[in-house]
Curated annotation (Swiss-Prot):
Function recorded in the entry: Catalyzes the NADPH-dependent reduction of L-glutamate 5-phosphate into L-glutamate 5-semialdehyde and phosphate. The product spontaneously undergoes cyclization to form 1-pyrroline-5-carboxylate.
Entry keyword annotation includes Cell membrane: no
UniProt source species: Dinoroseobacter shibae (strain DSM 16493 / NCIMB 14021 / DFL 12)
Pathway in which this enzyme or protein is active: Amino-acid biosynthesis; L-proline biosynthesis; L-glutamate 5-semialdehyde from L-glutamate: step 2/2
Superkingdom field: Bacteria
Catalytically driven reaction(s): L-glutamate 5-semialdehyde + phosphate + NADP(+) = L-glutamyl 5-phosphate + NADPH + H(+)
GO BP, one annotated term: L-proline biosynthetic process
Protein name: Gamma-glutamyl phosphate reductase
Length: 421
């Protein structure tokens, strides 16, 4: 696998190796897979200085490419973020094993006993952009769920991802599992992405994690099934019955904690009655924190806001920018989100149970929240240890994609010489 100039041959070899590894992983004991993840976590921590040095090369590359501050933040690793990678690997290792779990079982009058049990999907292809931690998250979750994985990281994170991948291979080797269970495409050549999208003989599902351009290309060109992770155009609606203290706290966190993640709030909707009664001091708080608030005609009365343009609504800024407008009640908020949202994560701030129920019932985002920061839209925060992404489609996986979502199922039917009449 040394001739990287012949991309089709390279990818065919990777695919064949992954398929063979998947067949072995399907019956590998749970404790063996967990051992690999624990050993990988130890390797990541032991090599943290090397990873940070490799990341510095990636950051230089990103600066030369003119990456935005948000993209540079996604790319950056320090000791605290590496500790997060290690913690994620260990958390996934400690989870209950999804493979072989009995989802349901029943007896039929014919004498048959039927069980529905979880099984791995097979080989998963993950295509992602600048976040090197996805290398660890995706590798861990696929291994936990008994799947082989082919990782194609962004060119920006090439050096960081390569070192993290080496640690994952160390873990596989320590547990006596095939090192080809987790493979990283060893070239920045974009032709590798095109090959992955057509590898129907060896890849069972593709998961793209990145911006609209990447996801759109995958959806348009893939001949392999896709779990789509679309933009995080996350809304927060301040209802007439919102608690002022909770509102101020949640909005500031949802926008400013980390602007470059898909769970960052991008649009603020304010109930007209609330605004008439209370104003919107939380907008002043955002401005004081350095956020550019692009406001509609009504909210432009607040000093420091700037006029919103039509295309500011329905836009993922991934920056210290938020769009804001006044709406007429919860139904106005629902109508706006249906038009401009990406079905990722949307939040209502209210103390009114009936209004919250209406918001939950009439929107179909993958994640709906009440009185909580949209930055909780994360598999780790959901107790999954890690995530590959937030699936916004409606087929198979939806919301945070953890190990359980990377499985299918099969039926095990037992009889006793039973025949059909």
């Amino acid at each position: 696998m040394k001739d990287f100039a012949d991309i089709p041959a390279l990818m065919a070899e990777i695919g064949t190796a992954a398929k063979a590894a998947a067949a072995e992983l399907a019956f590998a004991p749970a404790d063996q897979r967990a051992q690999a993840l624990t050993a990988a976590a130890d390797a990541v921590w032991a090599r943290r200085d090397e990873i940070i040095a490799a990341n510095a090369r990636d950051l230089d590359y990103g600066r030369d490419k003119g990456l935005s501050p948000a993209m540079m933040d996604r790319l950056a690793l320090d000791e605290a973020r590496i500790q997060g990678i290690v913690d994620g690997l260990r958390a996934v290792a400690a989870q209950d094993d999804p493979v072989g779990a009995v989802l349901s079982e029943w007896d039929r009058p014919t004498g048959l006993h039927i069980r529905r049990v979880r099984t791995p999907l097979g080989v998963i292809g993950v295509i992602y952009e600048s976040r090197p931690n996805v290398t660890a998250d995706a590798g861990a979750l696929c291994l936990k769920s008994g799947n082989a994985v082919i990782l194609r990281g962004g060119s920006e994170s090439f050096h960081s991802s390569s070192l993290i991948h080496a640690c994952l291979r160390d873990g596989l080797r320590a547990a006596d599992l095939p090192e080809t269970a987790i493979q990283l495409v060893p070239t920045r050549d974009r032709a590798a992405v095109g090959e992955m999208l057509t590898m129907t003989d060896t890849i069972d599902v593709i998961i793209p994690r990145g911006g609209k351009g990447l996801v759109g290309r995958v959806q348009a060109e893939a001949r392999v099934p896709v779990f789509a992770h679309l933009e995080g155009i996350c809304h927060i609606y301040v209802d007439a019955d919102a608690d002022p203290d909770k509102t101020a706290r949640v909005i500031l966190n949802a926008k400013t904690r980390r602007t470059g993640i898909c769970g960052a709030a991008e649009c603020l909707l304010v109930d007209r009655a609330w605004y008439d009664r209370n104003g919107a001091t939380f907008i002043a708080d955002l401005i004081a924190a350095g956020v550019e608030v692009r406001a509609d005609d009504t909210l432009q009365a607040i000093p420091g806001t700037v006029p919103a343009k039509a295309d500011d609504f329905g836009r993922e800024f991934l920056d210290m920018i938020i769009a804001a407008r006044v709406v007429d009640g919860v139904d106005g908020a629902i109508a706006h989100i249906r038009r401009y949202g990406s079905q990722h994560t949307d939040c209502i701030l209210t103390e009114n149970d009936a209004t919250a129920a209406r918001f939950f019932q009439r929107l179909d985002s993958a994640i709906l929240m009440r009185n909580a920061s949209t930055q909780f839209a994360d598999g780790g925060e959901f107790g999954m240890g890690a995530e590959i992404g937030i699936a916004t489609g409606k087929m198979h996986a939806r919301g945070p994609v953890g190990a359980e979502q990377l499985t299918s199922f099969k039926y095990l039917v037992e009889g006793d010489g039973t025949i059909r009449a």
